[in-house]
């Protein structure tokens, strides 16, 4: 819960100072290994795909976010967080980002951002938002990608007690072009400003800062 409500202004300032010190010692300044490029086009993408280092991939648990996450930033999620401290059975846990290479589309990194919502008598639900990491363009630093969200998912995981079997997830594709994922879909620039075997720092274009720990 502290990852969603990270404290007052002074606490955020101290945490940000620690993160900035980490970034100054970043052992992986180019997490995409100078992503391969087939031409010199600087208008649309850095190349024809991403080439992530192995340390980037896998499951990452959110430790800190200065302004919530794409899953928890809604009014509903914030209201649930407030209820968690007042009513038993309500809460928000398991905020995880999973990264893997898309085997069907080489050069594309897929991401899943998910969290577990406990709604008391209404059960526990896993909410996920999926998307692709794509080249951000020659004008962007090599540690920066374009994140395009393309799918929303929700799954019932418990109802008063743990369910005896896993129910299927309901998936909803976000509107947009299938051939050009950027068109008509939510997108944002994302920078990996620190990466080692255990921790990762990501920064959004709007100033949001995220600290992850490998699961």
Regions flagged by a language model, labelled:
Residues 2-215:
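Soluble ligand-binding/transfer domains with enclosed cavities or grooves
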